[in-house]
């Protein structure tokens, strides 16, 4: 069986094969039909796949052929290839068009599904979907960069206090915000990282994993990613769910290789870079 958390794409695919061979569970459930669930794959191409918190908002914009194979199981190519290989290898549901997002929660809870690719926000929903919350865990994305694993950390919705409120209202609001962030335990209950700097309480077992927070775009390029996404129509990490669905379709039908898909994406990105006059730095 699977005794260790997989840390590389090869280890992850091997674990999926063991689930298929030794159980009746669906190894990896794609949630293709929901559409929006596909966006989770885009979220892992930055910090998780490169170990570089300047990659997604800065270097990615200037990289030549960012979807190329780096040959070491890292970068965007490695992220999307996991999905392609899992589908092509029969390690996902039999019919991707009939997946059911709401139903998948209880299926994971009761052991009918081995794993799904989702953000940590979904973890408590899976726990609440049945009687087997203790059987559910949340693992880092299975990519290692020079032997190290990385995960993205990001703030949730922020709190604001109305500048036009009365002094008493502002004081009451501040007390509420401090209670929410320091005393309520909501981040722990929602399986997130603690808000309070002094706290280390979390259900996530990410020991040995380095958390990174994306650096913003450099000055003058705040809108460049949006422009490249629009020009290329790839919409990376911006609702480009159809391109991820296409990976599943081609892998299932066997009518286009993964490298051909990535070559198409590289060409679209190159054309967009040329349209926007982007300097290619690597």
Give residue ranges: language-model regions.
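Short helices/loops that flank or line small-molecule/ion binding pockets
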Residues: 14-21, 102-116, 246-254
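Stable alpha-helical elements in mature extracytoplasmic
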Residues: 8-15, 37-41, 76-83, 104, ...
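Extracytoplasmic/periplasmic solute-binding protein
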Residues: 13-65, 113
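C-terminal lobe and pocket-closing loops
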Residues: 119-132, 144-243, 276-282
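Extracytoplasmic/periplasmic substrate-binding proteins
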Residues: 40-41, 48-51, 78-169
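Flexible glycine/proline-enriched surface loops and loop-helix/loop-strand junctions
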Residues: 22-26, 58-69, 88-89, 155-160, ...
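Glycine-centered hinge/linker elements that transmit conformational signals in sensory
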Residues: 14-18, 60-96
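Aromatic-glycine-rich donor-binding/catalytic loop that engages nucleotide-sugar donors
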Residues: 1-5, 89-91
């Amino acid at each position: 069986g699977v005794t260790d958390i997989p840390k590389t794409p090869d280890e992850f695919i091997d674990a999926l094969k063991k689930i298929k061979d030794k159980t009746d569970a669906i190894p990896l459930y794609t949630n293709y039909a929901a559409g929006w669930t596909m966006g989770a794959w885009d979220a892992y191409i930055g910090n998780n796949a490169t170990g570089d918190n300047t990659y997604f908002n800065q270097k990615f914009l200037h990289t030549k052929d960012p979807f190329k194979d780096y040959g070491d199981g890292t970068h965007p190519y490695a992220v999307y290839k996991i999905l392609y290989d899992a589908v092509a290898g029969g390690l996902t549901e039999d019919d991707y068009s009939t997946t059911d997002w709401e139903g998948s929660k209880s299926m994971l809870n009761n052991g009918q599904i081995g794993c799904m690719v989702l953000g940590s926000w979904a973890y408590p929903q899976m726990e609440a979907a049945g009687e087997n919350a203790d059987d559910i865990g949340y693992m880092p994305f299975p990519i290692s960069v020079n032997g190290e694993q990385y995960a993205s950390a990001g703030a949730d919705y922020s709190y604001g206090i109305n500048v036009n409120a009365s002094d008493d209202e502002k004081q009451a609001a501040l007390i509420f915000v401090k209670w929410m962030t320091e005393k309520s335990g909501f981040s722990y209950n929602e399986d997130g990282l603690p808000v309070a700097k002094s706290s280390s309480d979390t259900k996530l077992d990410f020991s040995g994993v380095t958390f990174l927070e994306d650096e913003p775009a450099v000055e003058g390029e705040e809108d460049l990613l949006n422009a490249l996404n629009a020009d290329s129509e790839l919409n990376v990490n911006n609702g480009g769910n159809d391109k991820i669905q296409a990976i599943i379709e081609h892998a299932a039908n066997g009518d286009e290789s993964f490298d051909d898909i990535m070559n198409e994406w590289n060409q679209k990105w190159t054309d967009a870079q040329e349209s926007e006059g982007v300097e290619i730095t690597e």
